[in-house]
């Protein structure tokens, strides 16, 4: 994966939308680009290219190609009910410094941030992988969506 051209409509609008949802105490589930957007919009930053750090593959949409360790006592750990999960991956950027007010909830073996959340929000969870591509065969991944939908009710 590589950076595409900037989207002059999407790029400035999404951080505003995220902050508006959080201000209105609406649930947020941020996937892939979404975790990166959430972190930057709230004051964190990104690794622009993770290739120099790569020890595990980050370029397979469909396969479970690397292990993520989930921190205990986080929303993500309560949803998944396990300390490690196998995930897919399709990215070349990643969260570097986690934004103030967010907590780290998951890491890959090579130290890439795979999950962040905002504990003082109704539901605000970001994951770097694509649970939507794994949820049909993996109840833990489906649990992410079930928890999000429950928070939306």
Feature map (PLM): residue ranges:
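Conserved G/P- and acidic residue-centered "switch" motifs that form tight phosphate/ATP-binding loops
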Residues: 32
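Catalytic beta-strand/loop cores that center a nucleophilic Ser/Cys/Thr
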Residues: 73-120
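Hydrophobic, aromatic-enriched interface-forming segments
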Residues: 35-37
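Acyltransferase
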Residues: 127, 131-153
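Anionic-ligand binding region
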Residues: 48-75
